[in-house]
Regions:
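Glycine-rich N-terminal segment of FAD-binding domains in flavoprotein oxidoreductases
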Residues: 121, 125-187
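C-terminal substrate-binding/cap subdomain adjacent to the FAD-binding core in PCMH-type
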Residues: 238-247, 254-443
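Conserved glycine-rich FAD pyrophosphate-binding loop
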Residues: 19-27, 160, 175-179, 183-185, ...
C-alpha cells in the first residue's frame, strides 16, 4: 500500500525514482529486519537506501491507516544502525559485477539490474505461511516488453531460473526465485480506448491507480485489492471482487492481453496460433509467460448508484437473499460479509475493531451483512423485497459514530424500538434522525482513540465524502487493506455452487480445522457469480508471522484445508480451488466453473 497514493498524502519520493522495493517503506523495513537478524552485511546500496529516506512521515499516514504502525521508527533505526557501523569503521560490501549482471544491464540500463543483497533481500519473502524464503541472485527492472523478451532469452540460454513479481502480496511463494526476480513496477502505461470500451494496462499498474484514472473519465473497471498489480492479479486469480456478480470473472474482464513466452517470443490472446489460455485444468499449472499488458473492459457508471447493507442473524438467510438478488440480477455488486471483515474494515484501530465486533454480534444481533451496490432501480428492488437495511445515510452515521455504538444511549434506543422482526428498527420512519442524534457521528469522534500526532490528519481524511460512500469504498477497496492489521492471514478461497447447506458445511469444516490447530478464524466474504449459479467463498485463518509455532500450526491447518477442498472436489465435481486458478486467470469463466 505504500506504493500507491490512496490517501492523497503522497508516496515515498525515493521509491518513485528508484523503483526497487528497497526504496519504499516496505522494503526499508524488510532491510532493517535482515540487518538486525544478521542475514546480510551492510552494502553500498544499504547506505543509499537509508540516505534517500528524508523521514518525511508520509509512510506513517499510509501505514497507520492500514496496520496501525509507524514505519518512520524503523527508518530512524535503519539510519542509526548504519551510522553506528560506519563510526566503528565497519566494512561496506561492494557487490561485484559478473557476466550475467553485465548482460542484464546492457538490456535494461545500468541502474535497473543489481545483485546487491540489500536490494535482493527485500524480494526474498512473501507473507504466506507456506512460503520458504529464497534470496535471489539478481533483481531486474525491465521498462518495455522488448526488454522482457531479451531478458527471458538470456535466462533461457543460460538456464537461469526466474520469477516475475507484482507487488509482492501473493502468499504462495510463487514470486520468489534463487535466480532472478523480475520486477515490472516501471511499466506503468495506461492507454484508454474509449470508443471500444477498453483500457490497455501495463504490468506495473496498480488497481487503485487504474480505477482512479477510469473514474475520472466516467468509467469503472473490475479490479481487486488497491495495491494489486492488475496484470499479475488477472494472471493469478482472474480478479475477484464484489463486482463479480455484475461483471463476471476471469476472461470476462478483458478484451485482449499480450505476453512474452519463456523463450522470449511474443503472443496475445487474440492470436489464433497462441497458447490456449482460455482453457482451464483443475491442477497446478506453470506460468505461460509474462503478461506485459491487458486490455480490460470499461464499464459505464450512472449518477444514481448507491449502496445498502442488509443485516442478517444467520448465514443461511444471508445466502438465500444474496442468491435471490443474483438470480434476479439486482445489483452490480453483491457480497456476504462476515463480522471479522465488517469490524476490521470500518474501524481505525484494533481495539475498536474488537469492541465493535462484539457489539455487532452480541448487542445488535448482526452476524452477517449483505452488501448491494446498484442504481436507483436496484436499490428500490431491494427495498421492495422487504428486508430492513442500512442505507447510505445510516451507513455514514454508523461509520462516523462507531465509538458511540458502545454507549448505553444507543443500545437503550435500539431496545426501545425492537420488535419480533429482526432489525425492524431500521424500518421505523425517522430512525435515521434518531440514530444520528444518539451516535453523534463525526470524523473527530471516529479518530479520537488513534495516535494524537496523526489525529488531525485522519480527521480531515474521514471528512471526505468518499470515505463514507459505499460505492466508492467498494470500488477502491482501501478499507479491505486492513485485513491483516491484527495478524497475518492465510486464505481458503473456493468457487462452489451457491447452496446454503454446502456453504454451511464448508464454513463449519474450515472452522473445525482452525480450532483444532488453535488459530483465530472467520468467514471473509461470499459473492454470487453467474446469476447465482456459483459463488466465490473466502474463509481466513489468522496467525502471528513472528511466532514460529503459530506459523507451523497454520501450515498444518492449510494442508488440512487443502485436503478438505480436494476431497469435496473429487466427490462433487463442482468445487474449484484458487490454488488451481493461479496462472490460469485468463480462462473462460465457463471453463473455470463448469468443466
Amino acid at each position: 500500500m505504500c506504493k500507491i497514493d490512496f490517501l492523497g498524502s503522497g508516496v515515498c519520493a525515493s521509491g518513485l525514482e528508484k523503483h526497487y522495493v528497497s526504496y519504499y517503506p516496505q522494503g526499508r523495513m524488510l532491510l532493517y529486519a535482515a540487518l538486525a537478524e544478521g542475514k546480510i552485511p551492510i552494502t553500498e546500496k544499504c547506505l543509499k537506501i537509508a540516505d534517500t529516506c528524508d523521514l518525511c512521515g508520509r509512510c506513517d499516514y499510509q501505514c497507520y491507516f492500514v496496520t496501525e504502525l509507524r514505519p518512520t521508527l524503523v527508518m530512524k533505526a535503519l539510519k542509526a544502525e548504519i551510522a553506528s557501523h560506519l563510526e566503528k569503521g565497519g566494512k561496506v560490501e561492494k557487490a561485484p559485477e559478473d557476466p550475467v549482471l553485465r548482460e542484464m544491464r546492457d538490456i535494461v540500463g545500468e541502474d535497473m539490474a543489481t545483485n546487491d543483497r540489500a536490494i535482493a533481500v527485500t524480494y526474498s519473502r512473501d507473507p504466506g505461511p507456506l512460503s520458504v524464503p529464497k534470496m535471489p541472485a539478481y533483481v531486474v527492472l525491465p521498462g518495455t516488453k522488448g526488454e522482457i523478451s531479451a531478458l527471458l532469452k538470456l535466462f533461457h540460454q543460460r538456464k537461469i531460473p526466474w520469477a516475475v513479481r507484482g507487488n509482492g502480496s501473493q502468499n504462495m511463494g510463487f514470486v520468489m526465485s534463487e535466480g532472478v526476480v523480475i520486477d515490472t513496477n516501471r511499466m506503468t502505461e495506461i492507454v484508454f480506448d474509449e470508443k471500444n470500451w477498453a483500457v490497455r494496462v501495463g504490468p506495473g499498474v496498480a488497481a487503485f491507480d487504474l480505477q482512479r484514472e477510469a473514474v475520472k473519465r466516467g468509467y469503472r473497471v473490475n479490479v481487486a485489492e488497491p495495491a494489486a498489480l492488475v496484470c499479475a492479479n488477472m494472471m493469478c486469480s482472474g480478479i475477484f471482487s464484489t463486482f463479480l456478480t455484475g461483471y463476471g470473472t476471469a476472461a470476462d474482464n478483458c478484451v485482449n492481453a499480450e505476453f512474452v513466452a519463456a523463450d522470449g517470443s511474443f503472443f496475445s490472446l487474440s492470436d489464433k496460433e497462441a497458447p490456449n489460455l482460455f482453457a482451464f485444468k483443475q491442477a497446478d499449472q506453470g506460468l505461460p509467460g509474462i503478461c506485459t499488458s491487458v486490455n480490460l473492459k470499461l464499464h459505464p457508471m450512472t449518477k444514481d448508484e448507491a449502496g445498502v447493507l442488509v443485516p442478517f442473524d444467520s448465514l443461511e438467510k444471508a445466502l438465500v437473499f444474496s442468491r435471490e438478488c443474483a438470480v434476479r440480477r439486482i445489483g452490480l455488486a453483491v457480497g456476504v460479509l462476515g463480522a471479522e471483515y465488517i469490524s476490521t474494515f470500518l474501524t481505525p484501530t484494533k481495539k475498536l475493531a474488537a469492541e465493535i465486533k462484539t457489539v455487532f454480534k452480541n448487542k445488535l444481533g448482526i452476524e452477517y451483512l449483505v452488501l448491494i451496490i446498484g442504481d436507483q432501480y436496484a436499490i428500490q428492488s431491494v427495498s421492495a423485497m422487504g428486508h430492513p437495511c442500512f442505507d447510505q445515510r445510516l451507513f455514514r452515521a454508523l461509520f462516523l459514530g462507531l465509538p458511540s455504538l458502545r454507549s448505553a444511549n444507543w443500545l437503550a434506543l435500539l431496545d426501545s424500538l425492537s420488535s419480533a422482526e429482526a432489525f425492524s428498527y431500521l424500518k421505523i420512519k425517522g430512525f435515521a434522525e434518531l440514530a444520528e442524534t444518539a451516535l453523534m457521528p463525526s470524523p473527530a469522534q471516529l479518530v479520537e482513540e488513534i495516535d494524537p500526532e496523526l489525529r488531525s490528519f485522519y480527521e480531515k481524511i474521514y471528512a471526505r465524502p468518499e470515505m463514507t460512500d459505499l460505492v466508492w469504498l467498494n470500488m477502491f477497496r482501501i478499507l479491505s487493506s486492513r485485513m491483516g492489521r491484527e495478524k497475518q492471514f492465510s486464505v481458503n478461497i473456493i468457487y462452489l455452487p451457491l447452496e446454503a447447506d454446502l456453504i454451511g458445511e464448508f464454513c463449519a469444516e474450515f472452522k473445525r480445522i482452525a480450532d483444532r490447530h488453535g488459530l483465530k478464524n472467520d468467514l471473509g466474504f461470499i459473492t454470487p457469480i453467474d446469476d447465482g449459479k456459483r459463488a466465490i467463498l473466502e474463509y481466513d485463518y489468522f496467525f502471528d508471522q513472528n511466532d514460529p509455532d503459530e506459523i507451523s500450526r497454520t501450515q498444518r491447518a492449510a494442508m488440512d484445508a487443502g485436503a478438505l477442498i480436494e476431497s469435496y472436489s473429487a466427490r462433487l465435481g463442482t468445487i474449484r480451488w484458487i490454488r488451481h486458478v493461479v496462472n490460469q486467470g485468463f480462462s473462460r469463466k465457463e471453463n473455470l466453473l463448469y468443466t
